[in-house]
Amino acid sequence: MAYQNNGGNFRGPRHSFNGQPSGRGNFQRHDPEEDFKSKLTSLIVRIGDKATSSLESNIDALANALLADIPKQSSLIQDILFKCVSSLTYKTPIYATLVGLINVKNSEFGKEVVCRLVDEIFSAMEKKKFHNAKLLIRFIPELVNANVLTINAIFELYETLLSVLNTSDYTPNKADYFVFLVLSTIPWIGEHLSHNHSGQLDAVIEECESYIQSRSTGDKKFYQAYNNGYTDDRLESMLKQIKSLRDCDQPWIVNGILRPYKHFNETLTSSSSQQHILPTIHFPEDEKLEYPNNLNKPLFRVLSNDNNNSVERYIVEDYIIDILSFFNSDHKECSKFIYSLPVENEIDDIVVETILGEMFMLPEPTFKPIYYSVLFVDFFKSQPSVIPVFAYAINLLFENIHKLDFEVMDRFALAFAHHLSNFDYKWIWSDWAQSLVPPTAAAAAAAATTTVEGSTSNENKEDSTATTTAIIEDENQIRNRELRIIYIKRVLSSLCRLSYLEKIKQNLPSEYHQYLPPSPAPTFKFLNADNPEEESKELIAESHKLLLSFKTKEPLENIISHVANIPSHINIVELLTKCILQIGSTSFSHLTYAIERYITLFKTVLKSQDDRQECIRSIFEFWKLSHQHIVIVVDKFVTFKIIYPIDTVTWFMKPENIDRFITEPFTWECLHNSIQKTIIIIQTLTLDLEENQSQEKEFKLNTSISEQQLLLAELVKGLGSILSSEKYQLGASSKLLISGQLKSIIRKYFNQMKPVIQSQPQLSNIINQYTQ
């Protein structure tokens, strides 16, 4: 194979297609067959890495090279080709043109590709590889452009996809996805269809528009990450973009989509006998198949762009989202590939906004938030033009923190902390410090005086109205300032977790020190008789005995016997919990070892819900200077079934704990951890029951489901009670935070909440009242 690809260095993952590690130091004997496969893969994968003037000549040369190998390697070539088509997002036109050129001289190969394409689409759908399925569907219009398929193929495709709207059993997510597939192909085929089939194309667009307008959008606000007035979801945005493309001065001319087939137009259209009929496409009929649920959620828009209704915006954003998906295991290659896209305009604003949008997606991002955060670190090192755009977006979000969903605000804080930790904590801290300062008392006093001196004259009435407006604005400013402080505290707390307190202090301006958490240290009050609470000598002596028995590793039976004989007036639960935490305070591995070693002792002592509540109280008191330790310790105690998931809900909903803890981030970490534990338990028991049916296993599963439903019901009721009561010292920002966390719980655990709401309709009233 003499062909040399001059299209530039491949920016994709090195292991994606041939499975062979690259690099030196491999002294194994070469397999000629594997060498051939590797070279062939490299040629097909790398074609078009850089959209240079040599692209067309490279495609032509590769087509001629592959023609010689097709008689013996057709299956291998198709394997590689379809992996590329379904993964390398902007290269779809290149591979269609390649197939078109081969089809001119070997129509049997073209026919095989068309038949296999139908199978690949079904397989991708069945495996829920929806990004791959979209690109495979998009390959159809490109094959029409390359004269491999007849023009009827695209309308047969549209008819098949839109036929789902005429069935009675389709789900909203399925219908959204199929309409999305139709809209996502139009920019690639619109110009071709506009010549002789514009009426048919308009009919397709109108059918999509009719469906989009008929959809229920009542819960849109529930999933809005940033409430700045932009409410279009993906389908609504695409429809506007496509109609704008159709109705503009140069209709259907799209930048950002390669058109290599135009260079070969004469060759590709030399004979209509080489065109193939698209076989009927079938889709999986599995009712349990879960289609993407994010197409009806409001898009994230923070930067004021004039190009929101430009189809080029969608194309670049779609490329980026595909790349994020296909390269999620290699963030460095992902960041490189994004900036190798064949687009003429600067894309920094779209890159920043798209990745933030993916990170802030509700109810959950596609990948862990850290993935998106790491990409920004990569961009800062390799693409300096991103830096001012990123900084501008971060400042906008901080200034408008009240417009962020609370769950998103939390993700924003964690991501920003991670970013700062990678760049020596450098930021324009002085600018932010000003927005944390409260309004002056003088301004408030002046406003109050004006109100008191108001009269019945029109002029004074106007002054009074203006003053009232000013007071309202001040209240909003106070709320927004409090929200910024909550955000700053979350950022700084996360920074301390990623590093340590003293280092953060050294790198922060002094005005921020007041928002730092205290220095983490255990509080063990049994060390000596001079402790502030003046514990009895008897209690201190018992703690010393217990610690000594732990240190000398006395047999567990002896320790259990000793604890059983401790006088009843001594708080044994507190004593045991704090002594175990003391021996485990050196490190988290010490803690795990201590809990595992003495789990039987705990279960002997903790006999009731009151005992478990006392255990939690003791944990909070011991680690009152470290919220991170509280989260970890409580989670471990739940994991080892020393306390139950619902015990954390009961603890936080106690009146004496609400004012102290309910607005703290670690509270919600504990609650989410407890809910996740119930989900894991139910999943494990379900799998176990499926493998081996028994009444005992079924009983355990039903019991666990009931316990989970009780936990969720008590949590929603508790939060509703807090929000409706006036007895707690909660400001407006605190109530906003609690209602935001309630919304987060409903969103995140919607499937678990549904049966709870159905059995207890009063919960719907709480949810509707406090999450709108």
UniProtKB/Swiss-Prot annotation:
InterPro entries: ARM-type_fold (IPR016024), CBP80 (IPR027159), MIF4G-like_typ-1 (IPR015172), MIF4G-like_typ-2 (IPR015174), MIF4G-like_typ-3 (IPR003890)
Record carries keyword Nucleus: yes
GO molecular function terms listed in the Swiss-Prot or TrEMBL record: mRNA binding; RNA cap binding
Boundaries of every MIF4G domain copy: 37-249
Subcellular location(s) per record: Nucleus
Keyword terms of this UniProt record: mRNA capping, mRNA processing, mRNA splicing, Nucleus, RNA-mediated gene silencing
One biological process term in Gene Ontology: regulatory ncRNA-mediated gene silencing
Annotated Gene Ontology cellular component terms: nuclear cap binding complex; nucleus
Residue span of region Disordered: 1-31
Similarity annotation: Belongs to the NCBP1 family.
Function recorded in the entry: Component of the cap-binding complex (CBC), which binds cotranscriptionally to the 5'-cap of pre-mRNAs and is involved in various processes such as pre-mRNA splicing and RNA-mediated gene silencing (RNAi). The CBC complex is involved in miRNA-mediated RNA interference and is required for primary microRNAs (miRNAs) processing. In the CBC complex, ncbp1 does not bind directly capped RNAs (m7GpppG-capped RNA) but is required to stabilize the movement of the N-terminal loop of ncbp2 and lock the CBC into a high affinity cap-binding state with the cap structure.
Record protein name field: Nuclear cap-binding protein subunit 1
Organism: Dictyostelium discoideum
Upper classification of the organism: Eukaryota, Amoebozoa, Evosea, Eumycetozoa, Dictyostelia
Gene: ncbp1
